Amino acid sequence: MVDFKSIIAKVATGATLTRDEATDAFDAMMSGDATPSQMGALLMGLRVRGETVDEITGAVTTMRAKMLPVTAPPDAVDIVGTGGDGSGSVNVSTCASFVVAGCGVTVAKHGNRALSSKSGAADVLAALGVKIDITPEQVGRCVNEAGIGFMFAPTHHPAMKNVGPTRVELATRTIFNLLGPLSNPAGVKRQMIGVFSRQWVQPLAQVLKNLGSEAVWVVHGSDGLDEITLSGTTAVAELKNGEITSFEISPEDAGLPRAPADALKGGDAQANAVALRAVLEGMPGPYRDVALLNAAATLVVAGKARDLKEGVALGTQSIDSGAAEARLKKLIAVSAAA
């Protein structure tokens, strides 16, 4: 068993942990073998110094080893944001997930209830009528029959109960805010991940490369959004063919108009559910455009579109044909029957 005191002592000097040390330390925390004080000390020590790629890789390795998995096709994708961007925006990645699923790409979405906003992925899906507290086997059925499934993080990461109270007491961002999107229970190898700070764009792409992902976009909007934004440029780190490339994109690259950040302000889960359903029913406007933009990037990651403009064309067809809305209705039905 890891000597947790020596781990804390090492971090206290400003030294970094090896990948194996991080794996062992997080195993101790998630197994209930570390006290709340020890966990708080380590989490804040890492936060103040800044977590390294090796430390995040080790922590994710433990998260993945302890999660309850879901069976999904090898070409399934996930669209997810870390949350915590403080924007209070509408549920962009959730809406984009249905657009992508309507294009025939299987989506295995991993998410939770809101952290800093009024409505996280789980909140808005529940408001839409999707049953979220179902077993991993039932989620697998949704993925296979509806082409989209939602994995509610607390169900799939039961070991997190050992660190939950400490996280609540700390009441500030820790490494765990980064780990969720990296710990998809379906083991997807293709992801579009939004992060709350530009500093994490490149490192998280490197972590996913370390862990064997095939195709990834990690993004952060210039307005602070943990999605691809309409209001300005978006920083991207792309993992493709084993190489990481960094670049910036704008709405114009996808043939979409810009819109101010406040045009995407959301409300509570019920209000956001109404707005999401309106997009899937064909309502034009900034919410539709940002959903198309993020769906387009995901279709590029999935290998379904060559570029953002083709992705937007496919996404537009998904919405206007009713295919995206049909995926939502099918998910509601299959999850209810679970």
Curated annotation (Swiss-Prot):
Reaction catalysis annotation: N-(5-phospho-beta-D-ribosyl)anthranilate + diphosphate = 5-phospho-alpha-D-ribose 1-diphosphate + anthranilate
Residues the record lists as binding Mg(2+) 2: D226, E227
UniProt-annotated binding residues for anthranilate 1: G81, N112
Enzyme class: transferase
Gene3D superfamilies reported for this sequence: Nucleoside phosphorylase/phosphoribosyltransferase catalytic domain, Transferase, Pyrimidine Nucleoside Phosphorylase, Chain C
Annotated InterPro entries: Anthranilate_Pribosyl_Tfrase, Glycosyl_Trfase_fam3, Glycosyl_Trfase_fam3_N_dom, Glycosyl_Trfase_fam3_N_dom_sf, Nuc_phospho_transferase
EC id: 2.4.2.18
UniProt-listed GO biological process terms: L-tryptophan biosynthetic process
One GO cellular component term noted in the UniProt record for this chain: cytosol
Domain of life: Bacteria
Keywords in alphabetical order: Amino-acid biosynthesis, Aromatic amino acid biosynthesis, Glycosyltransferase, Magnesium, Metal-binding, Transferase, Tryptophan biosynthesis
Coiled coil: none
Binding positions (anthranilate 2): R167
Residues engaged in binding 5-phospho-alpha-D-ribose 1-diphosphate: 81, 84-85, 89, 91-94, 109-117, 121
Cofactor note as given: Binds 2 magnesium ions per monomer.
UniProt keyword tRNA-binding, yes or no: no
Cofactor (UniProt): Mg(2+)
A Pfam family recorded for this sequence: Glycos_transf_3
Pathway assignment: Amino-acid biosynthesis; L-tryptophan biosynthesis; L-tryptophan from chorismate: step 2/5
Residues reported in the UniProt entry to bind Mg(2+) 1: S93, E227
HAMAP family, alphabetized: TrpD
Described purpose of this protein according to its UniProt entry: Catalyzes the transfer of the phosphoribosyl group of 5-phosphorylribose-1-pyrophosphate (PRPP) to anthranilate to yield N-(5'-phosphoribosyl)-anthranilate (PRA).
Assembly behavior: Homodimer.
Family: Belongs to the anthranilate phosphoribosyltransferase family.
Protein name stated in the entry: Anthranilate phosphoribosyltransferase
Name of encoding gene: trpD
